[in-house]
């Protein structure tokens, strides 16, 4: 009993704001292929095996760090892919500030992702790249593939990428405000701030999982002797704490085009008056993975993509949360196997 009390006290101090944390994880080693503002491309270093097969490019969402793919030991999709013998790349957007307020979807579609795909392809033998995106990272990847069908994209997998925003309960308050005020007025505050600052992004992400936030203290108390449970909670908190902000133009496009007008569900996104991106122009194989228990992009909202992308296939990984689709402790059993099969085809 005395030893348990000592362990509990040590763990309680470690998870407190003054503590050093339960688990120290610096991430997988990686080499930088190029490093420019909002576009750093890294290749994870294999431990022993020589990479074989097509390379994989991991695309994070806007306003999310690359930690989503390398959360911690056992919850790292990047480590899983590297361990399977694939050359694995990740594109990092870095910090987003007020100075970046003019960055829009076009910057990702025409430059950031297109350049990353071509570079990864050239660095790995030129046989095509398997692109994997999570959440809005999947959206940007799909819009890139539709806009540039000649890019060397061998396949595209999107985890938790919503298409029909009318099916997502968490988005409905924003849509109600938009209907009452109109898009221009609804966007006044974010326009003045040059986007969505990182602190607001982090608070919004936490608000979309209220049960987790309300019960976190009780969860920590109940598991104060369980190092693994504490480390998982700590990793998620660190991940949320690393979220950058949304640039103004990109958030305006997200709000007005994807949410308010629900254009992805229609299959055509109108970036400007002169430019439309049609999902039917995607020529590569597409896999959509979703979960009925995802509070941010539930299964039906993700599966709606099969109605607008030619040949797209949907796979359910029910029981996983939004982040859990790519980095949950059950992802190796529920969602990663579908990716492995798809990449092997």
Where are these regions (language model features)?
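Gly/Ala-rich beta-loop-alpha elbow adjacent to hydrolase catalytic centers
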Residues: 132-137, 141
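Short beta-strand immediately N-terminal to the catalytic nucleophile in serine-hydrolase-like folds
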Residues: 131-133, 159, 289
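Short beta-strand/loop motif that positions the catalytic acidic residue
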Residues: 282, 288-290, 294
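Alpha/beta-hydrolase-fold enzymes
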Residues: 122, 126, 141-249
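Conserved loop-alpha-helix segment in the C-terminal half of the alpha/beta-hydrolase fold
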Residues: 292-313
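Alpha/beta-hydrolase active-site loop
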Residues: 102-123
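Short, surface-exposed "cap/lid" segments of acyl-processing enzymes
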Residues: 19, 26-97
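Catalytic histidine-centered segment of alpha/beta-hydrolase-like enzymes
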Residues: 296-299, 314, 320-334
